[in-house]
A protein has these predicted regions:
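N-terminal nucleic-acid engagement/recognition segments and initiation subdomains in replication
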Residues: 1-138, 153, 157, 389-394, ...
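Residue-level preference for alpha-helix termini and adjacent loops
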Residues: 55, 59, 64, 68-71, ...
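Feature primarily recognizes SF3-like P-loop helicase cores of small DNA viruses
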Residues: 94, 99-122, 176, 203-207, ...
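P-loop NTPase catalytic core of nucleic-acid-dependent motor ATPases
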Residues: 112-222, 226, 384
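Amphipathic alpha-helical segments that form well-ordered structural scaffolds
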Residues: 142, 162-166, 193-197, 243, ...
């Protein structure tokens, strides 16, 4: 069956060839022959056929997204996939033998690969380039409209960054992009459906990447543009989060396809996204999970569920891509967050981590402290009542992480002399110069009556 659904047979192809017979005969005449007048079984002769034959010319193309060879024309036999299959190869061998006397299968295959590479195309680029934007801004409205997310600067910037990164990845494979947008909310909200529609073509979306240490991870990514990591985000822990960070930061895979001889660097053309039903899906990490950008969805606030009118939703998303292409062409953007959004994200991520009891204990102790300088040993002994214990290195490191990332009102200093602890690195209270230092209620002053 042809791509448009019509039944095609060799008799139909025969009619085409009959109309074009002079062309086929011209090709036969132009093929190189040996001293005995027989057709040379050379790559060059095979190339001549693939480049000039009325049936084959332009029909075999290298898909730069999938890395596979696609057949984009009607070759006269029933096909169920655009990608080249073993059956297609056998049919092509038969055709070249019958019409041109070319029988060397290895040389036919080599010529087919060369011809396909010379006629390469990128389906996503071709699709994006034919889009015409109607001038209406939609990128910032996508998540509020279909998933009930907050319509604010953060949501708008994250969504715009994701779409621009996806465009960059198909035009500049392997470009640096290290952020994973994670949609967080209850089951049935349409999170995965949103990402599937965002990929435009369902074949360009995948949620099949279960493990990052799989030897076939490239094959799982091959031909996909938007890749959802749902199962991994559902079981994430302190160790796996580091693995995910490292994985999404990679810009290429080095992989050898089984039938190829040499491994090849394959720059990434995809972006990774995540979904989670759990509010505290990020493990406790006081140094920050800057590669993860959570967006909370609210199914009860949606303007229209994404599956209520699939055609309308897909068209809306397509126009958002047209808008994104205008931004991409302008060149006035970077594939990173603004400083304001980075700072906001750092604080907001805490809402998606388990509660950190140590932060509360230290913050309360500091708020009631009269001194303006502290060090990690002082906090260990006084805030946690370990007066007679010697802190271990990892315990001091944990306190440092809390002070540097989770405590407000204090700034890091390089050194200070402490009466009981000597010269130490530590922290100094940030005092508003326009206000007097506010002491705890129980602290005595020089003016208190005795």
């Amino acid at each position: 069956m042809s791509e448009n659904g019509a039944d095609v047979s060799w008799s139909d192809v025969g009619k085409v060839l009959e109309d074009e017979r002079s062309s086929v005969e011209d090709i036969q005449t132009d093929l190189a022959r040996n001293n005995k007048g027989n057709i040379c079984q050379s790559i060059d002769n095979c190339m001549t056929v693939f480049q000039r034959d009325p049936l084959l010319k332009g029909a075999i193309r290298k898909n730069e997204l999938s890395g596979k060879i696609d057949i984009v024309g009607n070759l006269g036999w029933e096909r169920t996939s655009s990608s080249l299959t073993d059956t297609d190869v056998y049919q092509l061998h038969w055709y070249l033998e019958k019409e041109y006397g070319l029988k060397n299968e290895r040389n036919i295959n080599k010529a087919m690969n060369i011809a396909a590479s010379e006629n390469r195309y990128h389906p996503i680029r071709e699709y994006l380039e034919q889009l015409v934007w109607d001038g209406k801004y939609r990128i910032g409205r996508l998540l509020p409209k279909y998933l009930g997310a907050e319509e604010d600067a953060y949501t708008r910037e994250i969504m715009q960054l994701l779409m621009l990164a996806a465009i960059h990845r198909v035009y500049e494979p392997g470009c640096k992009y290290e952020i994973m947008v994670c949609l967080v909310g209850g089951q049935g909200a349409g999170k995965s459906t949103f990402f599937r529609f965002l990929a435009i073509n369902d074949e360009w979306f995948s949620d099949d990447l279960k493990r990052m240490d799989d030897d076939n991870v490239y094959r799982k990514m091959q031909g996909h543009w938007i890749i959802e990591m749902s199962e991994m985000m559902a079981t994430v822990n302190a160790k796996s989060i580091e693995d995910i960070k490292s994985f999404i930061s990679r810009q290429k895979e080095t992989y050898k396809i089984p039938y190829e001889t040499h491994p090849e660097d394959r720059p990434r053309q995809c972006v990774f996204v995540g979904t989670s039903n759990s509010m505290d899906f990020l493990p406790l990490d006081r140094t920050g999970n800057r590669r993860f950008a959570p967006i909370l969805v609210h199914p009860d606030r949606v303007e229209k569920h994404i599956l209520e009118d699939e055609k309308e939703a897909r068209n809306y998303i397509i126009q958002a891509w047209a808008e994104a292409m205008e931004l991409y062409r302008s060149g006035q953007h970077e594939l990173k967050l603004s400083k304001d959004t980075e700072n906001y994200l750092r604080q907001m991520q805490k809402e998606f981590m388990p509660e950190d009891a140590k932060v509360g204990i230290i913050q309360l102790w500091l708020d009631e402290l009269s001194q303006d300088y502290v060090c990690s040993t002082m906090i260990y002994k006084e805030a946690f009542d370990h007066e007679y214990d010697t802190p271990k290195d990892w315990e001091l490191k944990e306190i440092n992480n809390v002070m540097n990332n989770s405590i407000s009102g204090w700034e890091k200093i390089s050194s200070h002399r402490f009466a009981e602890y000597g010269i130490q690195r530590g922290w100094r209270r940030i005092v508003d110069k326009e206000e007097f230092h506010k002491l705890p209620e129980h602290a005595e002053t020089l003016f208190d009556e005795k």
